Structures are given as C-alpha cells and as structure tokens.
Amino acid sequence: MGSRNASLPRICIALGLGDVQKLLAHARQELLAGETFLEFRLDYLPSPLDGVRAIAELLASHPECTILATCRRHQNHGRFNGSIEEQLRILDAAVDAGAHAIDVEIESAENAKTRMAELRQNTTVIISYHNYDGTPAMEPVLRRLAKIPADGYKLVTTARKPSDNEKVLALSKSGSKTPLILLAMGEIGFSTRVLSVAQGCLYTYASPHAAEGTAAGQIGARHLRNLYRFDKFTKAAKVFGVVADPVRHSISPAVHNRAFQARRLDAVYLPFLVAPQQLKDFFALANALPVQGFSVTIPHKQKILRYLDHVDPLARRIGAVNTVWKKAGKWRGTNTDAQAVVKPLSKHLRLPKSKVLVVGNGGAARSAAFALVDAGAQVSIVGRNPDRARALAKVCDGTPLLREHITRDTRFDALVHCTPLGMWPRVDETFFTDLVPADIVFDMVYNPLETLLVQRAKDLKRQI
C-alpha cells in the first residue's frame, strides 16, 4: 500500500473531540477552509464506533476528504480502555467506513503482527512511536519500528532542549525506504512541525482552527501555510529565527516571513524557545539545520556574546547583541537597538542635554543607555534590580535612581521602557503603578502594541 502515500496531503488536521457532533462540525469547518486531510481520534469519543459512523457520514458528503483513523490505547497515552484486539477491530471498521489510513502505536503493533499484515492489505498503515518524556537516540527507535512492515513510521518525541530538534530531523537523512513522520512535541520542538516535510517527511500535524490540538506544540494549518509559508519553501531554504524566552509573544516571524514572501525568497523565520541555560545547546541546533542568522531578545542579549566569533565595536562596548548572522562559517553579532531608540526620539526631542529616564537593566536597557549618552542626553537609570541598574549607570556615565525616589513631581523629557513588564501574556504588569514621569514615552514592548504604560501615557496626554 506504500504507493498510496504519494497522494497524502502534507498537513493532517488532528481532531480530538469528545462529542461526535462537534467532531463532525469541526471536520466540516476544516474542509470549508480548504483542508482535506483529517485525523479522527476515535479514542477521544465515549464510543469509538460513533466515530466510525461519522467517518462514513462525512465521506458521503465530502468524498474528496482523506481520513486517518486513530484509536490509541490508554496505556500508550490515548483514551481507549479496550484490548488490542478491540482496538484493531475498531480500526478495521474505520477502514470499512472509508478511512484511507490508520495509525497504530508500536506497543499494539508488536503484539499483533499478523493482524497488522492483514490490515495493510486493505489500507495505508502508519506505525507510531511516542515519547512524552524526552528525545532518546532515534536510530534504535526506527530499527524497532522497521521490524514491522508499514507504509509509514511516525516518531514523535518531546523536545526538552533545542538540539532535540536536530536529533529528530536528522533521521530524515537515515535513508529509510519507508516514509517517515518526524515531530518533537512542545514549544521547544516547534521547528520540527514547520521544517519536517521540507526535509522529506510524509506530512505534519496541525490543530483545528477553533479547537485544541491533540499534542503540545501543534498550531493551526492556516498559521503553517500563511505565516510560515509551509508549502512554499524547499529543503534548501535558508532558516532564520528569533531566540528568546518567552518567545510566543514575538511578532518577528510575521514580519520577516512576510518580507521573505514579498521578495520571493526561499527562506523561513522561526521562533526558537531557548532557556537561559540552553544557549550553548541552541548553537548545536543552529549549526546543524543550518540557521543563517537570528534575532536575539530577552533574556539572551548579553550572555550570547560569549558564543560569538566576532562582535562589532559598538555591540562590544554596549555589552549586548540583538542580531546574529553567520559569515564564512563564523557567528557574528551586532546591536541595532541603539539606533532604533535614538532615531525616533530625535524626531520629537533635541537629545543633547535632554533628561531621559531609561527603565530597565538588561540588554535592551544597555543599548538605549549607551546610545542616548553618546547622543548627549543626561541619562538616569532605574530598574527592578537596583544593583544592576547602578552598575549599568556606572559603565555608561548615567545616573542611578531608585524607583521610590521617582514621584509625581519628578519629570523627564523622555522615558524609554526596556523591561518585559506589560508584555503578553502578562499585560497587567507595569513598572510605574500610578504615574508616568515624562513628557515623551518610548515603550520597547510591542506585543501588545498598547501596553498599560502607553494607555496611561495617552490618558495623561503624553507624547507616545
């Protein structure tokens, strides 16, 4: 049945709902949106056979639909409490109802090899491996799967560190004669969901538009197609991204991928969730993909310097980098935050001898403080960590302040906010709870576009 794999669409919408009518409603909604490959998680239903009847009903009205039937047992992180024999009987019924393919976990397949061979005579069989704890060595897992003939092998792990993505995607180069589906669950493993098909995998999974997916890290097919241009870039595409923790708030993927599309570039820009202690590990992934360059934001702008081969003089002086790229095999870093602060402020304020309050003591605050001092401003620095704010003020020739010393009578020409306070999803947080001590407010937080600080500044008729 392996020849049928060629006709499988490249995005499978995972439908796991506990009500058969909701299952059908979401299935029809996806079909109206142009998706044609749906996974019916029969094990989510109180009666999986209701799902089998739903398959027949849907295919009667939508014969163009391709359905993958899954009925994962409870012992293997599914919801079906029956025996392996009952599980395979349900999947056999799904095939009779018109399902084009079935997914059987390796634990069941190993205990029913004869039945698996029989099922494969009538349908496309995917044998799957899931690891919810981490990402083990992948080659032994593939060898285990390969002992049972199938039309596709699915290997799904959980990414605990960035390089786990590389371990998973590297298997696409294994030379397997049987097509593979390779994914790493969780936000850290997001890149596998976008890149795996371009690397030669059979398909990837996406969540339905108006319901939760069936695995951590799934996103909607519309995001895959429209935001990440999933079906537009090739195996040779250049990979870029943003490195941060958190990273879900970032609008950088939307900005850069639209720019790539406008310029018809074979490239993709991804969000990389990298914890502070995982920066070194990220470079293992970056070198393997390979990543061509990336934006750097909270909390890595300072620590990343130690992993770069070359840093330009301004960024070295500031002690923070926000842009990294590879040239001649070497990682190079620069800082564009400095001019991003000075240029817009200069349009509204004569910076020499102006009084500017920089709020923060991290990489973005360092960039702003150094640039403003260089422009001739009198810079004061206040932060959540008074010791770090004091240290920053010392190295950039600024003046340290304590938050409690800033009152309603304190007034600056401009305030530059450089902390993550107010950033999605913690939108109710703000550094100043009851005042805006400046005539002009520059908030580096861009998601949401209007933070609590900006709202208060507008209420007080401050310039934004």
Where are these regions (language model features)?
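NAD(P)-binding Rossmann-fold cofactor-contacting core
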Residues: 375-396
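Glycine/small-residue-rich loop that forms an oxyanion/phosphate-binding "nest" at active or ligand-binding sites
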Residues: 67-111, 303-352
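Catalytic beta/alpha-barrel core
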Residues: 16, 37-47, 91, 99-111, ...
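Rossmann-like adenosine-cofactor binding region
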Residues: 395-464
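Phosphate/diphosphate ligand-binding glycine-rich loop within oxidoreductases
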Residues: 237-349
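Active-site mouth loops of central-metabolism enzymes
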Residues: 8-24, 73-85, 128-136
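Active-site-adjacent beta->alpha loops and helix N-cap segments on the catalytic face
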Residues: 45-60, 106-120, 135-138, 160-172
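Glycine-rich adenosine-cofactor-binding loop
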Residues: 184, 239-247, 335-338, 345, ...
